[in-house]
């Protein structure tokens, strides 16, 4: 049970509550069924709970709650709409500090004797955030909580994975090479086939094109993107623009696409995400890719494939 006043107040704040209407996968929610619970709110709370489980202090838990508060509607779609780098997907990171300062969050923290500067940078907390390919609460939560990950992990479960995650020197490592290898392989398969598969990448570009068109004709303004997914979608439908209508009508579970480098209808890309956990062995901390060279080669092959996609 969460009883600490600053955590409770932050969870109930307008900035956090808005995230209940922001889907982690953006337009992927329309082409994959059963992902309704994958919201930025649930992710942020899940990250906070993971940090709590592994003994992180109050400030790191608060930072975990806040780390995605600057996401726009449809999450990473902002990088496609506003000219961000789709191979980094860091639009929300770049505006996080400014977004927090303009929100009610500093006032909430001040009421509990905390300065916003103490908790607003997620990269100042080593359990919360680490660079790829290391484990962190953010990466653990968004992979292990995702319904599609389950079939890639099977017969292992998220609980099996977390049972072998330990904290050393305030960083996450794993104490079973076999479990770490299975998790890393499942993550790679899940991400490349599902989250960053052709259908999801194409769906991001299609919805981004619709939103850019709406911004151009005045059916949307930039501030609308800091609402919820359905609010933006309603405005797209209300635009009564044939091009917008045609684009958003394609985003259904029946949507499919074909990779075509010769005569593409659209071009897009996406960030390459993977994990290569450090494993505690009798010879010290060693990465999965070193313990399992075949996995290391598979990682390199997938990295080479992850470039501009044309459909």
Which positions does each model-derived feature cover?
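Short alpha-helical catalytic segment bearing the HExxH-like zincin motif
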Residues: 60-68
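Histidine-centered, transition-metal-coordinating active-site segments
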Residues: 1-59, 73, 77-311
């Amino acid at each position: 049970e969460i009883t600490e006043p600053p955590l409770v107040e932050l969870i109930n704040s307008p900035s956090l509550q808005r995230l209940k209407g922001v889907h982690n996968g953006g337009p992927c929610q329309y082409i994959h069924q059963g992902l309704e619970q994958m919201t930025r709110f649930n992710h942020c709370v899940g990250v906070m709970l993971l940090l709590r489980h592994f003994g992180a202090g109050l400030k790191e838990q608060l930072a975990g709650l806040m780390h995605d508060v600057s996401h726009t509607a449809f999450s990473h779609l902002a990088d496609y709409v506003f000219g961000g780098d789709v191979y980094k997907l860091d639009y929300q990171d770049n505006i996080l500090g400014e977004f927090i300062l303009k929100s009610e969050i500093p006032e909430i923290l001040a009421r509990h004797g905390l300065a916003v500067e103490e908790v607003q940078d997620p990269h100042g907390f080593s359990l919360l955030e680490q660079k790829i390919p290391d484990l962190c609460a953010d990466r653990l939560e968004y992979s292990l909580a995702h319904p599609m990950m389950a079939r890639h992990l099977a017969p292992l479960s998220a609980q099996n994975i977390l049972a072998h995650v330990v904290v050393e020197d305030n960083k996450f490592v794993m104490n079973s090479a076999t479990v770490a290898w299975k998790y890393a392989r499942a993550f790679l398969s899940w991400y490349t086939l599902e989250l960053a598969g052709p259908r999801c990448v194409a769906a991001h570009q299609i919805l981004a094109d619709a939103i850019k068109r709406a911004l151009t004709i005045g059916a949307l303004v930039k501030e609308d993107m800091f609402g919820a997914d359905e609010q933006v979608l309603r405005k797209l439908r209300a635009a009564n623009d044939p091009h917008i209508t045609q684009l958003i009508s394609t985003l259904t579970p029946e949507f499919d696409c074909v990779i075509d480098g010769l005569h593409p209808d659209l071009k897009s890309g996406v960030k390459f995400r993977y994990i290569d956990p450090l494993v505690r062995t009798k010879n010290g901390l060693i990465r999965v890719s070193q313990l399992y060279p075949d996995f290391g080669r598979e990682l390199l092959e997938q990295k080479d494939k992850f470039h501009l996609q044309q459909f």
